[in-house]
Amino acid sequence: MTSDGTPTQSGRYPAGGHAFPHGSLTGIAQLERHEILYLLDEAEQWVDFNRQSEKHCDLLAGLTIINAFFENSTRTLLSFEIAGKRLGADVVNMHAAQSSVKKGETLIDTAITLNAMRADAIVIRHGSSGAVDLIASKVDCPVLNAGDGQHEHPTQALLDALALRHALEARGEGSEDFTGLTITICGDILHSRVARSNILCLQAMGASVRVCAPPALMPVGIERMGAEPFHDFDAALKGCDVAMMLRLQTERMSGQFIPSAREYHHLYGLTQHRLQRCAPDALVMHPGPMNRGVEIDSDVADMLDRSIITRQVEMGVAVRMACLDILTRKGRGLPGWQGDLGKGQWA
């Protein structure tokens, strides 16, 4: 950190060699392992910054960030807004109800409109998979994916990885990656962009990933992503080091995928009894929002020694500060950039 508490660039890479050559961040799938580790290292420094009494800097002073959310959000929108403001940027929030999409404007026209506003970065959440890639191809500034349909939610996976790394370090089990860990993700895998991004991120960091869901909520061919599928929750939990629970995304379900919430909890809810099937010191995670009494019991979610759910929320601000900082470096004239900013970065 500098004398005023502002983080300096990670020392993982030699001077002049930029570790993140991408103009936008729309998915984990396009990241190399060293790029994921670089983002986490940069975010690590912002964790310390955010724990100071003075949590504001002028790193992005004079820059404008648009948070364009075409889907409702609470924690993700707040996290990005806080991240931008702590960096000193001017942050403008655009909600779905306020957008011209409600009046019939096409996504391409929306992208053209956003580009004409000359923002320095745009954060986008959209209900359609691939929408963020499309917008990124039409604008001249960095784009961050805050979740698109059932596709990806990259900053969620990064903050989950950072929260897990922090928890392991607190136990004296610190390592830059997750080699040797078995992580079970259980819930609505079919509709979950969080699951997809986490599978990619956790595997890139060396973890073995299991996914568990009722047959109707398990994507066909999920094993092609390298995850081991289970329908039996008890079997999926056996000996795992981390249990990551996901909510049922009823807003994306057009039919009856489960008999009832009560039946789902009976078969797939994480209880104290089920937690005993995991490794003795297994950690519990949930990206939120939680449906207590459905996918997870309150006494499990609130376990001080095992649950790192609130830590996940804390890490979200740090990860998003790091991403905003890194992606705007070329626009701020900083040296060491190897990539090209602009259209088609993730095509």
Swiss-Prot record:
Could you provide one GO biological process annotation from this protein's UniProt record?
amino acid metabolic process
GO MF terms listed in the record are: amino acid binding; aspartate carbamoyltransferase activity
Signal peptide interval: none
Q: What Pfam families is this protein classified in?
A: OTCace, OTCace_N
- The chain's coiled-coil residues are none
- Function per UniProt: Catalyzes the condensation of carbamoyl phosphate and aspartate to form carbamoyl aspartate and inorganic phosphate, the committed step in the de novo pyrimidine nucleotide biosynthesis pathway.
Question: Per UniProt, which keywords does this protein have?
Answer: Pyrimidine biosynthesis, Transferase
Question: What catalytic activity does the UniProt entry give for this protein?
Answer: carbamoyl phosphate + L-aspartate = N-carbamoyl-L-aspartate + phosphate + H(+)
List of residues binding carbamoyl phosphate: R75, T76, R125, H153, Q156, G288, P289
**Pathway, according to UniProt?**
Pyrimidine metabolism; UMP biosynthesis via de novo pathway; (S)-dihydroorotate from bicarbonate: step 2/3
Q: What is its EC number?
A: 2.1.3.2
- What protein name does the entry list? Aspartate carbamoyltransferase catalytic subunit
The record's similarity note reads: Belongs to the aspartate/ornithine carbamoyltransferase superfamily. ATCase family.
* Quaternary data: Heterododecamer (2C3:3R2) of six catalytic PyrB chains organized as two trimers (C3), and six regulatory PyrI chains organized as three dimers (R2).
| Record organism | Erythrobacter litoralis (strain HTCC2594)
